[in-house]
Amino acid sequence: MKNNFFEAVKGKLIISCQALPNEPLHSSFIMARMARAAKMAGAAGIRANSVVDIQAIQDEAGLPMIGIAKTDYPDSDVFITPTLKEMRAVAATGVEVVACQVTGQRRPHDEKLAEIVQQFRTEFPNTLLMADTDTIENALEADRLGFDMIGTTMRGYTPATQGMNIADHDFEYLKELRSQVTRPIIAEGKIDTPEKLKCCLELGCHAVVVGGAITRPLEIATRFIEAIK
């Protein structure tokens, strides 16, 4: 399974099909159709949130998947597949990859990342792990813990990186990350043009995830409306 995923997405686009409960397109049926459209366009894989969406998309698209479960806990700011419970639930769907947040913040119930990674490996030895990171330091920690791939997903979305973008200063952050980690890099987060997608691949990223710029019409329409106000 591991080799198949990496081979399937190498040098290609993975499209994130997600809609949260407060968004107009929140529906497993709609996300599955969104994934079908992504497949028709030539996407190599899908990233999806929640067990029900993942299962609907598996039935509809049949592409390699990165699965997550966004879950809020009162005692932590970590929300992307934050505990072993969510990791297990996502892995049980049969997705090729489970992604979880690795941002150095306290996890719910004070779970320790090293311990839950070790336990997950025991229970799901054939499922790949992706680290959704925000800084070089946290990417290196994920690398050390044996995550199979390093994502830039959380860059710009944590207190330490607020307002930052992987495209800043001619992709300086991505170049630095590439020089320091040993695992394949999955570029993700604020990649909103085809040109940025190409740059990420040219800089050596294994694959690129694009979401909002393709699959969130409310955000896309808002950008256009704001331009003429």
From Swiss-Prot:
Pathway: Amino-sugar metabolism; N-acetylneuraminate degradation; D-fructose 6-phosphate from N-acetylneuraminate: step 3/5. It comes from the Bacteria. The keyword tRNA-binding does not apply. The keyword Isomerase applies. It is an enzyme of class 5 (isomerase). GO terms for cellular component: cytosol. Keywords: Carbohydrate metabolism, Isomerase. CDD domains: NanE (cd04729). Its EC number is 5.1.3.9. It catalyses: an N-acyl-D-glucosamine 6-phosphate = an N-acyl-D-mannosamine 6-phosphate. NCBIfam families: PRK01130.1. Converts N-acetylmannosamine-6-phosphate (ManNAc-6-P) to N-acetylglucosamine-6-phosphate (GlcNAc-6-P). HAMAP family: ManNAc6P_epimer (MF_01235). This is Putative N-acetylmannosamine-6-phosphate 2-epimerase. It comes from Pediococcus pentosaceus (strain ATCC 25745 / CCUG 21536 / LMG 10740 / 183-1w).
